[in-house]
Amino acid sequence: MINVNEFRPGITFEFENEIYVVISAQHSKQGRGQANVKTKVKNLRTGAITIKTFSGGERVEKAHIEKISMSFLYNDGESIVLMDDSTYEQVAIENTKITWELNFLTEGIKVKLRKFNNEILDIELPAKIELKITSTFDAVRGNTTTNPTKRATLETGYEIDVPLFIKEGESVIVSTEDGKYVSRG
């Protein structure tokens, strides 16, 4: 059992027959009332992100998640295929379980497969990833009022805002948490 006051990003727990990972947790106390813990959590079975509020001191069951290092091989349209780096065993995961992660998967990338009681839940990406810009337009001179950006398409098809100095064919570092530009690659 784990006390909800100990919630930090990355902690996994069971609640109402579902498995969640904490994305963020905010502790608040109002006057003489009991403290509350407002958490943003991701359901590891469905991929849905929700906000749950717990009473301070409430206890939930800790979920012991097994993480296996895998390499992404390919996407066949309905599922992705990963290969275990040590046993060379291949595993398929439905695309519906990993819709967000699909935006950042390139051939050969190392990911962590999350399993709970031999049930495949989802994959965990590195915090930042390097991707190539496949298309963007040239900067327009004079368009530099406040923090100017332009749209760019990555090699995976995902679109992000990048600074004006980034050109087509360059690599950029992207955060997999929020899908935003971090720096040049």
Swiss-Prot record:
One of its GO terms (molecular function) is translation elongation factor activity. The keyword Cytoplasm applies. SMART domains: EFP, Elong-fact-P_C. Belongs to the elongation factor P family. Pathway: Protein biosynthesis; polypeptide chain elongation. This is Elongation factor P. Keywords: Cytoplasm, Elongation factor, Protein biosynthesis.
